[in-house]
Every structure is written in structure tokens, then in C-alpha cells.
């Protein structure tokens, strides 16, 4: 680790007690966890996430992105900002530690809490929700539409749009717990109606009725929809022909918006500068500005 270079927290803090020092590991800094390599996929497996992802009778699946790498980075950022805020009060820095496994268990939210608080070990349910229905993708004439009627009011609006308003007063489906218990009876009744029209037609009508829903997009469809609703998801960094399209920072600031100035460097763009800097003899009296020059 960094101790080989004299850069572990204790050494750095001895020279600068106000330093805020962040560390991210796979399984913590304890003697048992520190020796384990931390890769996102391994943590998806060992945290239990993969046991929750996939069809009930199928194999466990990983998430489509390195979700816990991202989450741990966000947790570290929150920790650093909290430590900086504390330093304004007490003048002291501190060591902020984050590990992938703890971030993962936190990110499992209701699933990990169900086990910790009640001993309930959750299981895979495909795209179904354990305690809500309809709350999953349902097939239309040309593809699937996610419908999340999370309460009885929304369910009533949904079946009215679908042309089967009598289902809202059917004793099997009146309450959410009834709909969940009888989902295998309710699903084909909804699907029979949904299959009569394309998903985007249903999307427009169901949304207009106040029921949350959405089509399952590919990534290009996700970007296109963000553009359609005015989120401006793509920003061009740089100028002219060297400008590089990138995904926009998701955080909007009313007073201090991000400044997208420098595009990613081209291959070896700064190579000569770096090689010259590495070859130069170190001057302990040089300022940071002189060293960077």
C-alpha cells in the first residue's frame, strides 16, 4: 500500500494535522479484509446483490454496470465533504475510510435491512416486486412497458385507461395486498388489454392518467428521452473539431455551474511534458507552480 512510500494517513497527518485523507478499499483496512482484492463483480457476488438479480428459477446475474465502484466513490465524496465541514468547526482533519462491501450492504437498502432487522433472507424475483403489483414490465403489442401502480388510486386509474374499470372493485384486487397475492390471476387480465396497442401509445395514455410507467429503452433511447424532456444530457467539451461529446454532470447549480474546459487528452498529447518533468531533478525549494511548469 501507500505505506511503502511514506504516504499512509498517520505519516501524512503528522505533517499536516488538518489533512482530510480518503481511502477506498474492497473489504476494509482490518487484518482480514485488507488482504482481499476488491473488484466490483466480486462484491456484487459476496454482498448478496447477485442473489437478488435474475429470474426466480434462473442463475444469479450481475448488474449491467460496476454499481458498487460508483457507489463507493460517491460515499467517499460525501465523507470528504463531511470531514471538510467538520474541519471548519474543530480545525482538525481526519481519515475517511470507505469500502466496497459496506457501500454494497448500504445500497441493498430494504433487502439488507429486512435481514438485519427481521432475519428475512430475500430471493430473486426477476422483474417483479415482492410487495407491489403491478410493478414490473408487462408486454404490449410491440414490446414491454414498465407499469408501477403503487397504490389503489393509481390501480383504479390504470384499469380505467385499459378499459376494464371493473377490476378496481373486484374483491381479488381491491387492496395492494390482494393484488400482490393474486398477481398470477391479475397479470393476464392486464396483458390481454395491453397487447392490443403499441407500448408508446399506452405510455402516453397511462402517463396522462397519472400512473407512473415507462418503456424499456436501450441507452440511445435513454439519451434521446433525456433530450426530449429538456435535460440536455450531452455536453461538448473543448472547441471546434477537438470538442469531445460527454455525458453532462447530473448536478445542476443555480449559482456555480460546472465549467467544461478541457477535453480528454489525445494519445501522448502530454507525453513529452510528463517525460521531461520525470527526468528533471527534484528541487525541494521549488514552489508547486514551479514544479508544475
Each language-model region and where it sits:
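Active-site-adjacent "lid/gating" segments in soluble enzymes
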Residues: 3-145, 149-150
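Alpha-helical scaffold segments in soluble metabolic enzymes
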Residues: 76-83, 111, 157-161, 189, ...
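Short, hydrophobic alpha-helical segments
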Residues: 84-88, 162, 278-279
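Short, surface-exposed loop/helix-turn segments at secondary-structure junctions
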Residues: 115-122, 225-239
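Aromatic-enriched alpha-helical interface/lid elements that frame and gate functional surfaces
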Residues: 133-209, 213
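Conserved PLP cofactor-binding pocket of PLP-dependent enzymes
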Residues: 207-229
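Flexible, small-/acidic-enriched active-site or ligand-binding loops
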Residues: 237-293
Amino acid at each position: 500500500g501507500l505505506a511503502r512510500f511514506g504516504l499512509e494517513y498517520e505519516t501524512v497527518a503528522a505533517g499536516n494535522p488538518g489533512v482530510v485523507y480518503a481511502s477506498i478499499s474492497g473489504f476494509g483496512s482490518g487484518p482480514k479484509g485488507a488482504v482481499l482484492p476488491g473488484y466490483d463483480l466480486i462484491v456484487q457476488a459476496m454482498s448478496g446483490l447477485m442473489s437478488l438479480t435474475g429470474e426466480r428459477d434462473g442463475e444469479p446475474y450481475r448488474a449491467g454496470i460496476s454499481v458498487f465502484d460508483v457507489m463507493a466513490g460517491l460515499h467517499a465524496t460525501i465523507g470528504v465533504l463531511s470531514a471538510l465541514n467538520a474541519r471548519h468547526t474543530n480545525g482538525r482533519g481526519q481519515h475517511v475510510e470507505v469500502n466496497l462491501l459496506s457501500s454494497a450492504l448500504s445500497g441493498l437498502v430494504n433487502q439488507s435491512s429486512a435481514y438485519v432487522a427481521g432475519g428475512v433472507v430475500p430471493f430473486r424475483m426477476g422483474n417483479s416486486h415482492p410487495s407491489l403489483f403491478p410493478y414490473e414490465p408487462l408486454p404490449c403489442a410491440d414490446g414491454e412497458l414498465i407499469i408501477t401502480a403503487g397504490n389503489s388510486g393509481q390501480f383504479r386509474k390504470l384499469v380505467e385507461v385499459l378499459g376494464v374499470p371493473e377490476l378496481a372493485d373486484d374483491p381479488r384486487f381491491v387492496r395492494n395486498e390482494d393484488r400482490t397475492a393474486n398477481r398470477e390471476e391479475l397479470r393476464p387480465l392486464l396483458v390481454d388489454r395491453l397487447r392490443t396497442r403499441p407500448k408508446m401509445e399506452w405510455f402516453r395514455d397511462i402517463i396522462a392518467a397519472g400512473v407512473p410507467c415507462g418503456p424499456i429503452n436501450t441507452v440511445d433511447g435513454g439519451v434521446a428521452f433525456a433530450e426530449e424532456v429538456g435535460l440536455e444530457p450531452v455536453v461538448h467539451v473543448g472547441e471546434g473539431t477537438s470538442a469531445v461529446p460527454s455525458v453532462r454532470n447530473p448536478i445542476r447549480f443555480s449559482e456555480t455551474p460546472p465549467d467544461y474546459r478541457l477535453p480528454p487528452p489525445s494519445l501522448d498529447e502530454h507525453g513529452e511534458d510528463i517525460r521531461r518533468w520525470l527526468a528533471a531533478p527534484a528541487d525541494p525549494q521549488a514552489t508547486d507552480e514551479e514544479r508544475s511548469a
